[in-house]
Amino acid sequence: MSRDTSGDALRRLDAALRGDVRVLIVELGANDGLRGVPVERLKSNLSSIIETAQSRHIAVVLCAMEALPVHGWDYTVAFHQAYPELAAKFDVPLVPFVLRNMIGNAEMMQPDMVHPNAAGARAIADVIWPYLKPLVDVHTAVPHQSRR
């Protein structure tokens, strides 16, 4: 959701996971980076989201985000490193920064040049799909295990 941080998403997680959820795409952190949310808090929030999903037998795909260098070089580097660290820790696929080829491209972005438009959303789906498809194939082929 627009302007939400990883903490906001964590607070809504239980509601988002109601029903027969089998795969979760976690694409969070851009607003954390813009607001200078401490990287350790970002990692804690993302860890809680991933742990909760995995405890319910929900497969997770993690999408890397990047922080603009407005909060200093150390922050930017730590933010960049958080995603591969979490992907390794939880053994989940890591999608490279999905906006990499869209930034500054007016054909892919809304007039604010921050959020993708419909064409940008399709491009994001194209980037994520190779990481998502194997999980969809596995997790939709058999009846789902109880998660609670």
Located regions from the model:
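A short beta-strand-loop structural module common to alpha/beta enzyme folds
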Residues: 1-5
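Alpha-helical cap/lid subdomain in secreted, periplasmic
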Residues: 8-148
